[in-house]
């Protein structure tokens, strides 16, 4: 029964086996230890299709249900704000991150939510993907 959730790839498909993308999948799923996702799990595969290494590394700094500003994430990463903002917007457009404006502070905020419910559905339902 466990194999039923593993992906079966066509012969022509080349998995990137990107550890950072896999780490992001596990971050979104709050998975640690023996229960982590693998490269064959759908949670990894759907991210690999549209998330590059830079996006994944920035995505690891997203709070799960916790809003963070570009400035906060850039400071955590010791990276330029414009670079971090670009990656966060790409994550939001792909469906991994959520993006809104904190009207009290008049600043953009970003966050992630767990796979259940919805993150995979947001990615799949995006006309851009």
PLM features per residue range, with description:
Residues 1-11, 17, 53, 61, ...:
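Long, compositionally biased, glycine/small-hydrophobic-enriched stretches that function as flexible linkers
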Residues 58, 64-77:
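Short acidic, hydrophobic short linear motifs in intrinsically disordered regions
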Residues 49-56:
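Short helix-coil-helix linker/hinge
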Residues 1-44:
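Long, low-complexity, charged/polar intrinsically disordered regions in eukaryotic proteins
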């Amino acid at each position: 029964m466990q194999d039923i959730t593993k992906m079966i790839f066509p012969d022509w498909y080349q998995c990137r086996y990107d550890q950072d993308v896999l780490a992001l999948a596990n971050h979104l799923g709050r998975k640690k230890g023996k229960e982590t996702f693998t490269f064959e799990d759908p949670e990894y595969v759907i991210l690999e299709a549209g998330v590059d290494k830079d996006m994944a590394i920035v995505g690891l700094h997203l709070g799960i249900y916790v809003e963070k500003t570009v400035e906060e994430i850039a400071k955590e990463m010791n990276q330029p704000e414009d670079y971090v903002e670009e990656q966060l917007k790409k994550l939001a457009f792909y469906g991994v991150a959520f993006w809104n404006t904190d009207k009290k502070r008049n600043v953009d905020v970003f966050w992630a939510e767990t796979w259940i419910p919805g993150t995979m559905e947001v990615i799949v339902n995006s006309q851009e993907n």
